[in-house]
């Protein structure tokens, strides 16, 4: 039950306390040595701002293995990989002076692209990133919308994403970026990018308003889909759909993305 899981995940409250400081920035303490909290009874405005902060567009995070879907799309669209392209994972992989591992230092062996995504194999995607090269990788990264705001019709969307530019993508930076560990972006950016990977290749501006009406209910403006650009081909997008369906399975497999399987949904 996705609604139940969401309710449980979001049930944890966040509590903030503001403490007094002196002119030098030192905390004021009582006779027991405890910090003295502010006594102004009206912090409702501050708490309200925190409560209504939309973290999906105002805060950054490192997407990690979720980004492997995007690297897979880059590989398929560029012709550097297909569903069946095999690469070997020995559990450790050296790039310059860095050594990368998969989770638990597990060696996945020879696997194709779909199997690598199911196994969340870091080493496979590092090698795929190397096949792409810094220039091609960055061009796709930019095309998927990670260097700009999504344009969603909500206030305060941040534009302060963190990532390596094309000239900064050296061997190590490219390797770390290929499995989502070297960029900080918003959750909504990731959502729109993955949508583009599976919807036929189109990067679409997300929106929450369907239409605007006047006081009499007359439609003043219809808010239609705004396709910003086509990032990958329809055929590449179809391959990514097939791979992601393989990850989820039919509800009988274990591991991979099996927990995301929902009967009746493709």
Name the predicted role of every residue range:
Residues 1-65, 70-266:
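Beta-lactam-recognizing serine transpeptidase/beta-lactamase-like catalytic domain environment
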